[in-house]
């Protein structure tokens, strides 16, 4: 099934869940704890070496805002989605009524579209018109399962009393039907197999495909880190000792790498590897040590792009953030956004294709009311008037990318011009303050009470104790 060069390229987009770059062997040489933490990820490593691996890519520092940013190409100041519990506009949950989904744009451009895994993007489902996905296999709760005409109760896997399993014996809805799984069925493997089947059918039909895999892994369960087909007992999803939990987490990343390798192998089998763009990224940094924190590590994620029309660069110092993904896919697919619609991001096509050797001067990350802005040599993190840091924490990073070697630079005259430049960029994104109407809502009141507590404030404004490499006072 050899694809012609004149055909539109296929696209695979893999979004991993709760994992920092230091967990991947291709990033290990650049990260301070890479040798200790990284699993063996040869398939991702191969894609990185044959394409582009961004040392510095920013998402948001939590699941929902990142996913919204990815499918819309817009920051939270536009969509109103700042945190899982902070959908700040009256109809933020229905953001796809105002912001086109990348799935819908590619479908309208003639692509077969499929999604498998975790949606977590508000009230509009990916299979509805605004979502744009033709086929789906989604981890779901009981309320959605009950709407399926083949629903006959659920006796499968549970993570706790209320959460249906995403891993062993998982709860999935596949194209409108509850998928009743077995005890030894593993959610990521099912989703991977679903997308590979979709890819093969699309190639046979001669239709370009967009396969979006927002994978549930390696996110923990409600009780702990799961076992997986590479490690541990089938069905075990509860707590274990710290050493075993760390080993499971590393092993789970290695298993996901194995599944990514299966996708690469299928592309080769179908003869379309050179006509398929392959992107691997993650929604936020690792839970506990990075996720939800307003520091750089919270929003610093893996980003590997390989395949169709991608120049072999390997690790790059160029910067990118999640708003770049949508305009990149739109350009590659020849899709057309609605008239007047403007992405916040910039298409990566000129850089990844080799037409240009630079991409953009600065990138932007956020979580809750904190903002993070970076250039190649400077960083402002936890810019957060609500929590007492109206100008954030300013660092000179030089050529460093993973916190080691950063120098606090407030008050140093030789760096003041750069600090003012970052603050000027921040003016484009007015921070959320106590005057925001969200805090007057019931959800906002509850969020505010927890968020501004001393314990939450200290966690949010600082790195985890094992990841402090510069003065944070």
Locate the predicted segments by residue.
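Formylglycine-dependent sulfatase
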Residues: 3-392, 397-473
């Amino acid at each position: 099934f050899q694809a012609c060069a004149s055909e539109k390229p296929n696209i695979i987009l893999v979004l991993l869940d709760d994992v920092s770059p230091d967990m991947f062997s291709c990033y290990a040489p650049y990260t301070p704890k890479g040798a200790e933490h990284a699993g063996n990820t040869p398939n991702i490593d191969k894609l990185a070496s044959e394409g582009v691996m961004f040392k510095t890519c920013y998402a948001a520092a939590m699941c929902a805002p990142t996913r919204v940013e990815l499918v819309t190409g817009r920051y939270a100041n536009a969509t109103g989605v700042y945190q899982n519990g902070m959908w700040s506009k009256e109809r933020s949950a229905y953001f796809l009524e105002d912001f086109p989904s990348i799935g819908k744009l590619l479908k309208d451009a003639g692509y077969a579209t499929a999604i498998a895994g975790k949606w977590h993007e508000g009230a509009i489902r990916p299979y509805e018109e605004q979502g744009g996905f033709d086929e789906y296999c989604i981890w779901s709760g009981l309320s959605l399962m009950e709407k399926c005409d083949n629903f006959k109760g659920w006796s499968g896997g549970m993570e706790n009393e209320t959460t249906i399993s995403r891993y062993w014996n998982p709860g999935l809805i596949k194209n409108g039907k509850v998928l009743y799984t077995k005890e030894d069925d593993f959610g990521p493997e099912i989703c991977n197999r679903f997308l590979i089947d979709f890819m093969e059918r699309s190639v046979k039909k001669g239709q370009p495909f967009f396969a979006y895999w927002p994978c549930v892994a390696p996110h923990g369960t409600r009780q702990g880190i799961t076992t997986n087909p590479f490690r541990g007992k089938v069905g075990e999803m509860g707590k274990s000792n710290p050493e075993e939990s760390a080993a499971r987490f590393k092993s789970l990343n290695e298993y996901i790498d194995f599944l990514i390798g299966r996708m690469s192998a299928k592309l080769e089998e179908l003869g379309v590897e050179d006509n398929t763009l392959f992107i691997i990224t993650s929604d936020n940094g690792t839970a506990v040590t990075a996720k939800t924190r307003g520091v750089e590590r919270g929003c610093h994620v893996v980003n590997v792009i390989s395949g169709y029309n991608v120049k072999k660069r390997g690790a790059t110092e160029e910067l990118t953030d999640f708003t770049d993904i949508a305009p990149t896919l739109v350009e590659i697919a020849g899709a057309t956004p609605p008239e007047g619609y403007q992405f916040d991001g910039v298409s990566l096509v000129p850089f990844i294709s080799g037409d240009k050797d630079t991409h953009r001067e600065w990138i932007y990350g956020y979580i809750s009311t904190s903002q993070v802005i970076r250039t190649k040599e400077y960083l402002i993190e936890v810019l957060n008037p609500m929590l007492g840091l109206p100008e954030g924490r300013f660092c000179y990073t030089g050529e460093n990318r993973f916190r080691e070697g950063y120098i606090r630079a407030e008050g140093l005259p030789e760096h003041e011009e750069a600090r003012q430049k970052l603050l000027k960029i921040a003016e484009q994104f007015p921070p959320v303050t106590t005057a925001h109407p969200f805090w007057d809502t019931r959800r906002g009141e509850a969020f505010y009470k927890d968020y501004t507590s001393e314990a939450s404030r200290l966690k949010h404004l600082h790195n985890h104790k094992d990841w402090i490499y510069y003065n944070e006072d």
